A protein has these predicted regions:
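Conserved alpha/beta-hydrolase
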Residues: 46-77
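Alpha/beta-hydrolase fold nucleophile elbow
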Residues: 105-120
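Glycine-rich anion/phosphate-binding loops
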Residues: 42-46, 89
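Alpha/beta-hydrolase active-site loop
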Residues: 82-105
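N-terminal cap/lid segment of alpha/beta-hydrolase-fold proteins
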Residues: 1-27
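Active-site glycine-rich loops that stabilize anionic/oxyanionic intermediates
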Residues: 34-42, 120
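Hydrolases whose catalytic domains are alpha/beta-hydrolase-1, hotdog thioesterase
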Residues: 121, 125-126
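Structural motif
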Residues: 31-33, 115
Length: 126
């Protein structure tokens, strides 16, 4: 089994609430942490089955909705609109989520995995 946690983290770029989802195994010690970065026009819940699969194998999985995606919007009409800051703001949001992971799970070094658009963004950060 695993537990799901949802929260919002404030973007350092412009104060936008970034929606974050974590799936945490019930048993410890954890085998590791996986930070997922979704692609363009996607949303975090799409990866929930994979996150649950990995949690059953001992991995903490964390993903967030990019600005303008899923629940990281100020209004539903803003889906697809990334607000100010462009790519720099998206990269900053990924870093903020990563930093929060480090603070919450200090004994682990997270792995980042990008999917489609996320591949380019994680390569830029790593």
């Amino acid at each position: 089994m695993s537990a799901k946690y949802e929260a919002y983290i404030e973007s350092e770029a412009d104060g936008l609430d970034i929606s974050v989802l974590a799936v945490v195994p019930d048993e410890t010690p954890y085998r590791g942490i996986l930070q997922l970065v979704h692609g363009m026009s996607e949303y975090k819940e799409r990866y929930l089955p994979f996150m649950e699969y990995m949690a059953k194998r001992g991995y903490v999985c964390v993903i967030h909705d990019h600005r303008g995606h899923g629940k990281s919007v100020r209004a539903m009409d803003d889906l697809g609109y990334m607000y100010g800051g462009g790519a720099d703001a998206i990269l900053k949001d990924i870093e903020v989520v990563n930093r929060e992971m480090h603070q919450q799970l200090t004994a682990w070094v997270p792995w980042q995995s990008g999917l489609l658009q996320g591949i380019m963004m994680t390569a830029w950060i790593c």
